[in-house]
UniProtKB/Swiss-Prot annotation:
A Pfam family reported for this protein in Swiss-Prot or TrEMBL: LisH_PAC1
Gene Ontology molecular function: dynein complex binding
Cell compartments where the protein resides: Cytoplasm, Cytoskeleton; Cytoplasm, Cytoskeleton, Microtubule organizing center, Centrosome
Summary of the function given for this chain in its UniProt record: Positively regulates the activity of the minus-end directed microtubule motor protein dynein. May enhance dynein-mediated microtubule sliding by targeting dynein to the microtubule plus end. Required for several dynein- and microtubule-dependent processes.
Gene Ontology cellular component list: axon cytoplasm; cell cortex; dendrite; dynactin complex; dynein complex; growth cone; kinetochore; kinetochore microtubule
Domain spans labelled LisH: 9-41
WD repeats: 106-147, 148-187, 191-230, 233-272, 275-334, 337-376, 379-411
Similarity-based family: Belongs to the WD repeat LIS1/nudF family.
The organism of origin for this protein: Drosophila erecta
Entry keywords, A to Z: Cell cycle, Cell division, Coiled coil, Cytoplasm, Cytoskeleton, Microtubule, Mitosis, Repeat, Transport, WD repeat
Domain comment as written in the entry: Dimerization mediated by the LisH domain may be required to activate dynein.
GO biological processes: border follicle cell migration; centrosome localization; centrosome separation; chorion-containing eggshell pattern formation; clathrin-dependent endocytosis involved in vitellogenesis; dendrite morphogenesis; establishment of mitotic spindle orientation; germarium-derived cystoblast division
Protein name: Lissencephaly-1 homolog
Length: 411
């Protein structure tokens, strides 16, 4: 169908074309166009840059149309399959669904970690480009970068109030950043002999734990920056450290294929968990809300009665996810389905689901009660390295070797 412009629209378009030709140095073309379009020599100021603005607006609209079409296709598919609509699902049942709300670019190397701020509508990404970026996850806007590390930033963590951000790096350092006002680095801590791979705050916020390729875990006092404890026991690179919400215990995982649970106030290892057949890449503590789903799934497996927990999930290069009762050192269930290394884990705040990120480029949503993968999102163009689930808002974020951070809406 031929589109017909009004006389006024034609005049405005001609003025915009003349401005574009003049601004970009096409003098001969401009002279010819002016004669043929019967234009005056001066272009009105209001037409300055108009052609470019119209062009970019069209591109934005096309992208929006494509996103809406993808959402419509997804909705139609769910209706056909008999899935419940958003109105019938409670927030505890909302899960991330394609397409992504935002795909954020700016990092110049692989994303190593993505986390939500505990209070504000912000998220943080760490990268092998040695920077940390802050984003608004509700608008997709880039806020600022934190620079100071001289090698890959491996992990980031907030204290409970979100006033401090801790980061660790392959440059062997741990840094503390003021996240309230200045966004400056306020402390740098040295002591590890190799790549520092993970960092986590103790819930009270007065100590930070770090895990390293030097096979140790260290505890640092926030106020002074001094190392006050060193935990030893792993036989290989310690990949991740995560503290239980109560703060009395923390867990670590390693290339030695084990997970260890430690007492925070002593240097003692409470339990060593063995069942994985390859490096354990990631761990995540289950919220209290997950206890009933885990117990039901475990009861169907082994009939050993009610488990008290606390419960811990682990993801490995053996492509499996395991759920453990750390009080007795028992693996309660194994989730299989990924086609490559499992790199990130996050529990749904409602406790029914677990989401995982993998080198198979997917995010998978696991129904814990039924021990099955209920949704697969083909999330990135390269390995998925990290994932986080917001505790209060219906959002999931993921990071990848493809250098993008993606925001997924749950519904």
């Amino acid at each position: 169908m031929k589109m017909v412009l009004s006389q006024r629209q034609r005049e405005e378009l001609n003025q915009a074309i003349a401005d574009y030709l003049g601004s970009n140095g096409y003098a001969d073309s401009l002279e010819t166009f002016r004669k043929e379009a019967d234009l005056s020599t001066e272009v009105e100021k209001k037409f300055g840059g108009l052609l470019e603005k119209k062009w970019t607006s069209v591109i934005r609209l096309q992208k929006k149309v494509m996103e809406l079409e993808a959402k419509l296709t997804e909705a139609e598919k769910e209706v056909i399959e008999g899935a419940p609509t958003k109105n019938k699902r409670t927030p505890g049942e909302w899960i991330p669904r394609p397409p992504e709300k935002f795909s954020l670019t700016g990092h110049r190397a692989s994303i190593t970690r993505v986390i939500f701020h505990p209070i504000f509508g912000l998220m943080v990404s760490a990268s092998e480009d040695a920077t940390i970026r802050i984003w608004d996850f509700e608008t997709g806007e880039y806020e600022r970068s934190l620079k100071g590390h001289t090698d890959s930033v491996q992990d980031v963590a907030f204290d409970a109030q979100g006033k401090l951000l801790a980061s660790c790096s392959a440059d062997l350092s741990i840094k503390l950043w003021d996240f309230q006002q200045s966004y400056e680095c306020i402390k740098t801590m040295h002591g590890h002999d190799h790549n520092v791979s993970s960092v986590a705050f103790v819930p009270a916020g007065d100590y930070v734990l770090s895990a390293s390729r030097d096979r140790t875990i260290k505890m640092w006092e926030v106020a002074t920056g001094y190392c006050v404890k060193t935990y030893t026991g792993h036989r290989e690179w310690v990949r991740m450290v995560r503290v239980h919400i109560e703060g009395s215990i923390f867990a670590t995982c390693s290339n030695d294929q084990t997970i260890r649970v430690w007492l925070t106030n002593s240097k003692d290892c409470k339990v060593e968990l063995r069942d994985h057949e390859h490096t354990v890449e990631c761990i995540a503590w289950a919220p209290e809300a997950a206890a009933s789903a885990i117990n039901e799934a475990a009861g169907a497996d082994n009939k050993k009665g009610h488990h008290q927990g606390p419960f811990l999930a682990s993801g490995s290069r053996d492509k499996t996810i395991r759920i453990w009762d750390v009080s007795v050192g028992l693996c309660l269930l194994t989730l299989s389905g990924h086609d490559n290394w499992v790199r990130g884990l996050a529990f749904h705040p409602g406790g029914k689901y677990l989401v995982s990120a993998s080198d198979d480029k997917t995010i998978r949503v696991w129904d814990l009660r039924n021990k099955r993968c209920m949704k697969t999102l083909y999330a990135h163009q390269h390995f998925c390295t990290s994932i986080d689930f917001h505790k209060a808002h219906p959002y999931v974020i993921s990071g990848s070797v493809d250098q993008t951070v993606k925001v997924w809406e749950c519904r």
